[in-house]
């Protein structure tokens, strides 16, 4: 099992946490990570860009001038793409840019990104990270304690609780910090709250230099992404 230092909000080491090799210490699959990021960026595209062809531009029903004897170049319509205010040749039309990735590839990409952070010593695990009220100064002090004052940091929290929500609100004014609450409170399975890691994504993990997780978030990630390892052992 891989190990990582367990820190408090003062930046002090309070213990060691064992983490799953299957989730946090695999050989990263960069191809699958690229596919995941490509999917994310493609799915952000609105696909609403639109231009009119010569058949859609208004006007130009008649020939602008006779074919011969004017001394001017021949033209059949003012809607031609070579005319000002004419139609557009091969212009964009509304389309769906969205892409899909199967569940196994998504999970492999997430495990690869987590492993990159662990192997580069850019994964920090805290006992917990909650604030009594939204205050940017409080979160900034915590980041200074972790020597991340001027670094780009992604903070991922497990539940949509008040203390975690306050951290998310506190991080909105910090340009180098993004806070994700990886939870979907509306999701349930058989009447029970399903364990989800919604929001955790490869693009943000690669964009930000450091990844900060809580102990509960690590357990949650291992529960979701470690399913394949458990299935292999019981097969």
UniProtKB/Swiss-Prot annotation:
It comes from the Bacteria. The keyword RNA-binding applies. The keyword Ribosomal protein applies. Keywords: Ribonucleoprotein, Ribosomal protein, RNA-binding, rRNA-binding. GO terms for cellular component: ribonucleoprotein complex; ribosome. Residues 65-75 have a biased composition (Basic residues). GO terms for biological process: translation. Coiled coil: none annotated. GO terms for molecular function: rRNA binding; structural constituent of ribosome. It holds the Pfam family Ribosomal_L4. Residues 45-75 are annotated as: Disordered. Signal peptide: none annotated. Part of the 50S ribosomal subunit. One of the primary rRNA binding proteins, this protein initially binds near the 5'-end of the 23S rRNA. It is important during the early stages of 50S assembly. It makes multiple contacts with different domains of the 23S rRNA in the assembled 50S subunit and ribosome. Forms part of the polypeptide exit tunnel. Belongs to the universal ribosomal protein uL4 family. NCBIfam families: rplD_bact. This is Large ribosomal subunit protein uL4. It comes from Thermotoga neapolitana (strain ATCC 49049 / DSM 4359 / NBRC 107923 / NS-E). The gene is rplD.
């Amino acid at each position: 099992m891989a190990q990582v230092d367990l820190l408090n909000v003062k930046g002090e080491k309070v213990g060691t946490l064992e983490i799953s090799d299957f989730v946090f210490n695999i050989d990263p699959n960069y191809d699958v990570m690229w596919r995941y990021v490509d999917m994310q960026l493609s799915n952000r595209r609105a696909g609403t860009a639109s231009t009119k062809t010569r058949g859609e531009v208004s006007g130009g029903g008649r020939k602008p001038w006779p074919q011969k004897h004017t001394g001017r170049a021949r033209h059949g319509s003012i809607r031609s793409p070579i005319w000002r205010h004419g139609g557009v040749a091969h212009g964009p039309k509304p389309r769906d840019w969205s892409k899909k990735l199967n569940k196994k590839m998504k999970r492999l990409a997430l495990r690869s990104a987590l492993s990159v952070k662990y192997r580069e010593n850019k994964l920090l695990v805290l006992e917990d990270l909650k604030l009594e009220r939204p205050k940017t100064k409080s979160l900034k002090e915590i980041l200074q304690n972790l020597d991340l004052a001027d670094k780009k940091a992604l903070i991922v929290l497990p539940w949509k609780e008040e203390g975690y929500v306050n951290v998310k609100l506190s991080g909105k004014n910090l340009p180098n910090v993004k806070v994700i609450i990886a939870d979907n409170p509306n999701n349930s399975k058989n009447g029970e709250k399903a364990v989800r890691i919604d929001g955790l994504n490869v693009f943000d993990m690669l964009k930000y230099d450091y990844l900060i997780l809580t102990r509960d978030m690590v357990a949650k990630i291992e529960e979701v992404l470690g399913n394949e390892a458990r299935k292999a052992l019981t097969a």
